[in-house]
Amino acid sequence: MAGLGLSLMALTIVQPVGAADTPATGIAMDSPAGQKLLLKPRTRRADYAALMQWYETQANLAYCGVASSVMVLNSLAVAAPKAEGYGTNRFWTQTNLFTVPTSRSFVEASRVAREGMTLEQLHGLLASVGTGVRRYHGESLSLEQLRWLLRRGLAERDDRLVANYDRRALGQKGGGHISPLAAYDPDQDRVLILDVARYRYPAVWVTTPDLWRAIRSVDTSSGRSRGLVIIEPPAAATAPSQAGPI
C-alpha cells in the first residue's frame, strides 16, 4: 500500500503560480484532502496514472476538446502520426491530430480554434481516428446512471471518460468546457476532473450531482445538452459492450 501511495503521489501535478482558486464546492487534487480522496482504497482510479503521464494544457482558449482528445489517445496508445520536431517518434499532439486525413475531413483546426467543439463533434473527431466512442447526452442520463458510468468506467484501464460540461454549474467562471475524468470516490460521491485549462483552474474533485447538472446544460451551438463520451482503443471497439443499466 505504501508503494502505491508513493507512485500516485509522484504523479501529482503542481499547480502553476496564479492558478484560480478552487470553487467552494470543489477539492483541489493537490490539496491534502484531494490527495486523501485519491489514495482511498475504494477510489476508482484505473485511468489516473495513464492520463497523468499525458496531461496536456490546451494550446488556446478553444482547444479544450483537442487537448482532452490528445490525452486520451496517447494514454490508450492509439497509433499516432509522427510528431513534428521529435524525429521519427510518434505520439498525438494538438497539431498532428488534424493532419490525419480522416480527422481533417471531419473538422478543421481553424474552426475549432474559433468555436471549440460540441459533444457531437468531440465524438466524431475521436471516432475518425479509429477509436470506439459512446456518447451520452446529459439530458438522457439520470444521476444514478451517471454514477454507474463513473463506477464502471473509472475502474477499468481500457477505456477513458471525457466530460463536456458548463463550468458555472461547478461554481467556476466561464461557460462550456471539456476535460477528462480520472477517478471516482464512491464514499464522498466525487469525481476527479483533470482540467486542461491548467493556467486557469486546478485538477479538482467535484460532486457527482454537480457534474450531472453541468453536463445537462444546453450547448447553444448544438441546441442539445452537453454530456460525456467513453472512448475505447480500436481493438476493443469491436467487442460487445458489457450490459448495464443504460
What are these regions (language model features)?
Residues N60-A62, D159, G227:
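A generic secondary-structure signal marking the coil-to-beta-strand transition
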Residues A2-T12:
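Bacterial N-terminal signal peptides
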Residues T22-L141, T220, E232-P245:
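Cysteine-nucleophile protease catalytic domains, especially the papain-like/related folds used
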Residues Q15-A19:
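Sec/Tat signal peptide C-region and signal peptidase I cleavage site
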Residues L141-L192:
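Active-site-adjacent substructure of cysteine-protease-like catalytic cores
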Residues S68, H137-E139, Y165-R167, D185, ...:
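A mature extracytoplasmic/lumenal domain signature
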Residues P186-I246:
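Noncatalytic regulatory segments and standalone regulatory/sensor domains
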